[in-house]
Amino acid sequence: QATTMNVRIEEGWKQALASEWEAPYFEQLTGFVSERYRQATIYPPGNRIFAAFDACPFDKVKVVILGQDPYHGPGQANGLCFSVNPGIAMPPSLINIFKEIHDDTGSPMPADGDLSRWAAQGVLLLNATLTVEAHQAGSHQGKGWETFTDHAIEALSRNRENLVFILWGSYAKSKSSLIDHSRHLVLTSPHPSPLSAHRGFFGNHHFSLANDYLARNGKQPIVW
């Protein structure tokens, strides 16, 4: 019998999302996810499913970057969207993100794709779907994760002020309606994927725009 995963998650998030833990959809989701981890290769590692929340406590969030679902190749996904661990080759989208940061802010290209240094500064690196089957992009979409992460976005929108939400690509942009635009800055552009980066991701200046907004609202800018 499937029981709710004992969700270990940062305390501020645990409270902000209190109504999720006993919700029927979440029980169903955790039953599904637990079973898939037993039967197949699932990414990220089970102890990293909620890594984005743990790395960026609820009351420390300043910027939200929304991804779709985790990388599905061996050793890539680490629970933070777009991020890979040191020593893992940077995926093309991440290289394009660093190119835009370099062009926008002058920051040099980093040695690796580990974005935990952003998370430590208050950047929530949130995938809409938090798990995926090896080599099958999108395989855990529509199982309940999107409900959970939508509620996380809504909780931030409602309970925090002057955050920056960065939405790249049509999927992320579809989450714009969850956010109160009068309380927060919402930045949108095409996705950094090589398929779309030249259609307006490059030159979007999102990193400097985010920092300008944070500074205007008395918050420490992010060292991108």
Predicted regions and their residues:
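Short, Lys/Arg-enriched N-terminal segments with co-localized hydrophobic residues
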Residues: 1-4
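A polyanion-binding, active-site-adjacent surface
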Residues: 7, 19-167, 171-174, 179-180, ...
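Short, contiguous pre-domain boundary segments
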Residues: 10-14
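Polytopic transmembrane helical bundles with strong interfacial aromatic enrichment
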Residues: 204-205
